[in-house]
């Protein structure tokens, strides 16, 4: 919201500097982005009167004699603008002047002709193209005839005004109007507002003879209109054009400019229809039908849906409610009779339509946040009165209206104790009365219980907490006492989840992995790509891009994108990990939030060790990846099993293992399927993913310190003849099933296959370590332990001790 300080001072008696005002507003709840003066950096710009204008042969140039109020007489200026002509008033930069981009104007010669200055366009003064009147977009600015040669252009075009840019949050949409800002400033400084009133002088003919209106949508609360006949469409007076341009709005003509003025003044969006272009007199506000089309004022054809609001005549859309009018009923220079519209449209519907069509306007931004119900009809009458003044129109008697809005003040009750407890203050009831008097709110009751009557212009206030905020703002945040919050002391230790994440991060980085952070949002296909049992997809309704539309259910797909990114840049040795959340949705994604699961994953590709003069290159393989996982679980003191699996279509069927904890699959480990790797454009890659939330539940509580035993351990080796399909895990399970408490370690140190063993057989050799923390082990005890283990191996895996 751009606020003219000149205009603001007409509405409220304030005599502080804009810097002070900006600081005060920012500290009371409305952020000021900055203050700028359009004339800043400009100098020596005056009104000029073109006395003569001669074409320069064989060029686009014109040799002009221009009166700039100098005693020496007219000055000669060479100008190339297509709309320069004798008799007009223009903007002249005299020698020594500064225009946009700090460009200095000097005396010079053009095609041998002396030029003592420059005739300027608004663009050359630094105004953006978007606000320059279209008739002057490709040429110089032509000033009204009453402009006096030699006068400074700054006050004439209000370039010396100070423009305050406000950043309006959705809860303070009341400040999207000059009246709203004036109320705010008046409350801050304890001043009163004075808004000019306009009285409509109505013709005897009733407006209802010309039009009728109806509402056929629950998204339209009220729809009111007035008819103004015999208007003269022409450029607006300079003061109105200046005001609109300083507010960032392009002047069009006096009729359209009046509706934009009222929008800025009241915050009430309005629209003007050419009455003679309406096919019939009955106007209906209704929901659009699927597939209906409307060409809007910007010349674009829009396809509508049932969620849109349209204004129709003869059952044909002529305006997109709350956003933009239609081209078919546009006001032009030939328009004579005008229908003014003031309505209240549903903000949610306007926002959806505006977003879907990518069509933002000053009107839509206000309807989205809300408008003041109190001034809908007042704004309509004000606009009609302005058309009487500026377009010589005749206003027909009465408004034509359908629907109504509630204009009764909102009653909110609270108590002095409630306020003081929440602000930590010792305010008196007199302080409360003073605050609400400044705000212009009614107040009844006493300290024990009082009721505030909130005008409809402040629709953001509805509960006690809102009143407390208003009191704090106007009383002054800087006056609130500084106190420390009262809370029970808490220990500064890490949570179990934080501790686990730190341990995993330390182990992963110790294994040579580099941490990455990938996008939580991905494509629907990648979201479920590495999920063994995918849950329902949680997708965004309006994603920024199609590649970021669904919440991920795995980390691996994002990691493979990172691997591909590195490989494409000649970094073929990749070792990365991530700790992040994946999302499981077991219900309806539109009604329920997904479960967030802490997850760890890594991806490795390329070489573990580079080739040098004495060692061979060592490529990444399944066992290297498994070693990282084993190291992780060993450090965490969590026992897991590895079970071969073919359930994951994106993983190699012969080199993938499910990671099982207490009978529950908590992750997987293995090689990415060659076809999947090809799809990603990456070489042979190994990945793993683990559900850290499940691991956290399995963590053992912190163990008390146990003294290191002084008694030695005893080791025994055992070689087993086994069937070739017996796995290492099955052998371990058999050994531990013997229940030997003194067995503290089992290590596989040899695997052998060959013809001597026979077909389908293999040999596996293990080192078993025993230890008694309280005594020396005897040979007899160790022999008994070995006997029990041998028996278990024979029974469980049909092992034969070699």
From Swiss-Prot:
It catalyses: tRNA(Phe) + L-phenylalanine + ATP = L-phenylalanyl-tRNA(Phe) + AMP + diphosphate + H(+). Keywords: Aminoacyl-tRNA synthetase, ATP-binding, Cytoplasm, Ligase, Magnesium, Metal-binding, Nucleotide-binding, Protein biosynthesis, RNA-binding, tRNA-binding. Residues 407-482 form the B5 domain. Residues 709-802 form the FDX-ACB domain. The keyword Ligase applies. SUPFAM superfamilies: Anticodon-binding domain of PheRS (SSF54991), Class II aaRS and biotin synthetases (SSF55681), Nucleic acid-binding proteins (SSF50249), PheT/TilS domain (SSF56037), Putative DNA-binding domain (SSF46955). Binds 2 magnesium ions per tetramer. Pfam families: B3_4, B5, FDX-ACB, tRNA_bind, tRNA_synthFbeta. Its EC number is 6.1.1.20. GO terms for molecular function: ATP binding; catalytic activity, acting on a protein; magnesium ion binding; phenylalanine-tRNA ligase activity; transferase activity; tRNA binding. It comes from the Bacteria. It is found in: Cytoplasm. PROSITE patterns: B5, FDX_ACB, TRBD. Mg(2+) binds at residues 460, 466, 469-470. Its main location: cytoplasm. GO terms for cellular component: phenylalanine-tRNA ligase complex. GO terms for biological process: phenylalanyl-tRNA aminoacylation. Its cofactor is Mg(2+). Residues 39-154 form the tRNA-binding domain. Belongs to the phenylalanyl-tRNA synthetase beta subunit family. Type 1 subfamily. NCBIfam families: pheT_bact (TIGR00472), YtpR (NF045760). Tetramer of two alpha and two beta subunits. This is Phenylalanine--tRNA ligase beta subunit. It comes from Streptococcus thermophilus (strain ATCC BAA-250 / LMG 18311). The gene is pheT.
């Amino acid at each position: 919201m751009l606020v003219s300080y000149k205009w603001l001072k007409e509405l409220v008696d304030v005599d502080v500097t804009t810097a002070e005002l900006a600081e005060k507003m920012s500290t009371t709840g409305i952020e000021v982005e900055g203050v700028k003066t359009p004339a800043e950096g400009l100098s020596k710009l005056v009104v000029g009167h073109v006395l003569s204008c001669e074409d320069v042969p064989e060029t686009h140039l014109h040799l002009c004699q221009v009166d700039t109020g100098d005693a020496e007489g007219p000055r000669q200026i060479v100008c190339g603008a297509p709309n320069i002509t004798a008799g007009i008033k223009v903007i002249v930069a005299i020698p020594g002047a500064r225009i946009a981009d700090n460009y200095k104007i000097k005396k010079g010669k053009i095609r041998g002709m002396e030029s003592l200055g420059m005739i300027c366009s608004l663009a050359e003064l630094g105004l953006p193209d978007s606000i320059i009147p279209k008739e002057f977009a490709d040429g110089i600015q032509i000033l009204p005839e009453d402009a006096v040669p030699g006068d400074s252009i700054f006050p004439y075009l209000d370039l010396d005004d100070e423009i305050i840019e406000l950043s309006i949050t959705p809860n303070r949409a009341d400040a999207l109007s000059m009246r709203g800002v004036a109320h705010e400033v008046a409350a801050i400084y304890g001043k009163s507002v004075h808004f000019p009133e306009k009285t409509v002088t109505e013709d005897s003919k009733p407006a209802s003879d010309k039009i009728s209106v109806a509402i056929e949508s629950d998204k339209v609360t009220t729809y009111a209109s007035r008819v103004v006949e015999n208007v003269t469409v022409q450029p607006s007076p300079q003061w109105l054009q200046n005001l609109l341009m300083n507010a960032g709005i392009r002047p069009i003509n006096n009729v359209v400019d009046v509706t934009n003025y009222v929008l800025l003044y009241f915050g009430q969006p309005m629209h003007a229809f050419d009455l003679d272009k309406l096919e019939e007199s009955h106007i209906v506000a209704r929901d659009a039908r699927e597939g209906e089309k409307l060409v809007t004022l910007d010349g674009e054809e829009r396809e509508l849906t049932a969620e849109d609001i349209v204004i129709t005549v003869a059952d044909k859309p002529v305006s997109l409610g709350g956003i933009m009018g239609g081209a078919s009923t546009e006001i032009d220079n030939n328009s004579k009779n005008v229908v003014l519209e003031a309505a209240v449209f549903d903000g949610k519907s306007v926002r959806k339509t505006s977003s879907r069509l990518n069509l933002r306007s000053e009107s839509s931004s206000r309807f989205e946040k809300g408008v003041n119900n109190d001034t809908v009809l007042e704004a309509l009458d004000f606009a009609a009165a302005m058309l009487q003044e500026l377009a010589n129109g005749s206003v027909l008697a009465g408004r034509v209206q359908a629907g109504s809005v509630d204009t009764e003040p909102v009653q909110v009750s609270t108590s002095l104790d409630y306020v003081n407890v929440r602000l930590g203050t010792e305010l008196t009831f007199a302080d409360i009365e003073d605050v609400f008097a400044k705000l212009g709110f009614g107040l009844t009751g006493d300290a024990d219980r009082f009721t505030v009557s909130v005008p409809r212009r402040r629709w953001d206030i509805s509960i006690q907490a809102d009143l407390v905020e208003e009191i704090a703002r106007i009383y002054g945040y800087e006056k609130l006492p500084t106190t420390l919050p009262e809370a029970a002391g808490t220990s500064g230790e890490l949570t179990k989840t934080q501790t686990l994440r730190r341990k995993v991060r330390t182990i992963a980085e110790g294994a040579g992995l580099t941490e990455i952070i990938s996008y939580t949002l991905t494509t629907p296909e990648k979201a479920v790509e590495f999920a063994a049992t995918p849950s329902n997809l949680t997708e965004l309704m309006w994603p920024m891009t199609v590649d970021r539309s669904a919440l991920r259910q795995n980390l691996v797909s994002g990691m493979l994108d990172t691997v591909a990114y590195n490989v494409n840049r000649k970094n073929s040795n990749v070792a990365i990990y991530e700790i992040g959340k994946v999302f499981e949705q077991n219900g309806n994604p539109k009604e329920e939030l997904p479960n967030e699961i802490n997850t760890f994953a890594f991806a490795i590709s390329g070489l573990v060790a580079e080739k040098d003069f004495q060692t061979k290159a060592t490529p990444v393989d399944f066992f290297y990846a498994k070693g990282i996982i084993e190291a992780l679980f060993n450090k965490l003191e969590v026992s897991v099993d590895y079970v071969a699996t073919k359930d994951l279509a994106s993983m190699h069927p012969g080199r993938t293992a499910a990671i099982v904890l207490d009978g529950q699959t908590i992750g997987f480990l293995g090689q990415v399927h060659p076809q999947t790797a090809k799809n990603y454009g990456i070489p042979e890659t190994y990945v793993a993913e683990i559900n850290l939330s499940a691991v956290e539940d399995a963590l053992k509580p912190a163990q008390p310190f146990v003294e290191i035993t002084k008694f030695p351990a005893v080791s025994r080796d055992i070689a087993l003849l086994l069937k070739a399909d017996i796995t290492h895990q099955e052998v371990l399970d058999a050994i531990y099933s013997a229940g030997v408490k003194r067995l503290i370690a089992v290590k596989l140190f040899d695997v052998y296959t060959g013809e001597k063993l026979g077909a389908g057989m293999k040999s596996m050799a293990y080192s078993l370590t025993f230890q008694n923390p309280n005594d020396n082990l005897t040979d007899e005890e160790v022999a008994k332990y070995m006997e029990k283990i041998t028996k278990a191996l024979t029974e469980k895996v049909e092992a034969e001790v070699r």
